[in-house]
UniProtKB/Swiss-Prot annotation:
The gene is APUM24. It is found in: Nucleus, Nucleolus. Residues 9-404 form the PUM-HD domain. Keywords: Nucleus, Repeat, RNA-binding, Translation regulation. The pumilio repeats mediate the association with RNA by packing together to form a right-handed superhelix that approximates a half donut. The number as well as the specific sequence of the repeats determine the specificity for target mRNAs. It comes from the Eukaryota. This is Pumilio homolog 24. GO terms for biological process: embryo development ending in seed dormancy; regulation of translation. It comes from Arabidopsis thaliana.
Amino acid sequence: MSSKGLKPQKSTKRKDTDSSAKFDSLKSKKPKLVSGEQQQHVKPKFGKPKSAGDKEQSTNLSKKERRVQAKELTEARKKKRKPHYNLEQELVSLWEKMRRRNIGKEDRSKLISEAIRKMKGKVPEIAVSHVSSRVLQTCVKFCSQAEKDVLFTELQPQFLNLASNKYAVHFIQKMLDGASKQQLAACISSLRGHVAPLLRHVFGSLVVEHAYHLGSAAQKQELLAELYSTELQLFKGLTTSNEKTVVDIIAKLGLQKGAVNRHMTAIIQPILEKGIVDHTITHKLLIEYLTIADKTSAADVLQLLTGSLLLRMVHTRDGSRLAMLSIKHGSAKERKKIIKAMKEHVKKMAFDQFGSMVLACIFSIVDDTKLVTKIIVRELEATLKDLVMDKNGRRPLLQLLHPNSSRYLSHDDLAALDLSVPSLCSMDKSETSSKTKDTDGNEIGEETKDEQEDTVAEHSDHEENVTAMGGKKDPLVRRQELLVNSGLAERLIDVCVENAEEFLQSKFGNEVMYEVAIGGSDGILCPSLSEKLCELYEAISSVAAEPKPQESEKDSEHILENFHSSRTIRRLVLNRPGFASILFKKALSGKCRSWAQGHCSKILSAFVETEDVQVREMAKTELQVLVNEGTLKISATKKPE
């Protein structure tokens, strides 16, 4: 067939152009590798372009050389950023020499003088650097008074600005430590009108606290006064040293209590919110605030303090009082929160002068004895020996053995335990004026019931904060549960038996030993632990029965001749006939003449002066001879203790 007459047929295949376009769209957008000759140099978006020579030079450098090069670049950047960079480097080199311990005083003095000469006119700028501020601190520590005056002159105009700086604050504290009375007064005057803002600042508060700590009573009052009222902040000299509290100041100046309350609230609230509560001036401010605060404001502040914040305050006099007030006026839930926050911190608190009083307050108030036993008592049991021998550590133990004793607690300590918030205390008295019995047999007030019903409907979480001071349990029952039922008393007696001689001769341990030996106040240990107490009497008598140490043994002293132990044993003879009988039979019978002089004579005279007839008759035969001879002297007016 011929193909001439045939028409050309259309191709049924897809066009190559369509398929090629789709194929190109699926291709990777990453450019293919090309030879070095075909590559074009693209300018970098940032910084100066590197030349080919620089690249070759950097690739040819060793690792050590690259580090040196990077260090040089860093140094160059620091020089541009810091105007006194070279000076700082010079000061650091001098500092490395002057801070050595083996350097002579004259050499150090020369280095310090040179450093101060280099810094002259630039002290405020240098003080804000983390490196050079250390140089300043060392200079202030070892320089002469004339050099301190030079530094202080430069510091004074920039005092407030530097007070809020992270690094300069340490230099300022050193300057305040070495400041004269006039210089300290000038610094405190510079703080006038700025105390409240600085107390809200993390670093500024350190300067205010340091100045408050170093200042006199009048200067402390000056710093505190402007926190009470706007008038006291603006005008100087409105108060004197006679007005020691905010209540006295309000009475003298005729200020409005509500205005003072609002002013103090505005200052205190941000301080508590930021958690800057470590300073004594803040603790004093809070204590003063609670004396004038209304019921709602006082309850709010105490509620904010519950928990970990309170642990940071118990190391000061006013801080520990705030903790006691929080425990007294807090609800059961808040007390539980406070005690749980003390976990693993009880030992440290017990050895602290003021923290130990917080533990004593808990033992006197909190009714949840299971929680107190679990967290506080168990931690105290682990260090009983150290607690007994420590001046502060014995206080919680003595509070359980003999509560609120003026023999062991000072007047200030007893006043702290009796402290309360006036606005919350007045409400407590009105609530307890009419009491009824609830289903558990506990006494509660009718007004308390009404208020509880109202608070549930309106604002229960807030009003729950305000409760009656102290617990509902009988104090004797609470002591029984904490001391005897918990096993603390038994463990304490065992420790006393093991360390009888050491405790008796200790200035502080002998008092705990005495209270344990007599069975505590109200004889709380006697019914259930009488056998254990007899073991203690035997242990003391065994130590007393030991022979006198030889004259060559000057370091050792017999417990009958020791000042502290002889007084303690004498008191036990007068007050515990059972102990007196064991001691006389085991240690003194037939040996009274050899012990009739020195401190031991007071113990022998106690056998004659005791009110117990059996003890007197037991020792009469042997002691009466000594009395008649004049060897043993008995005071005619002396009465049994």
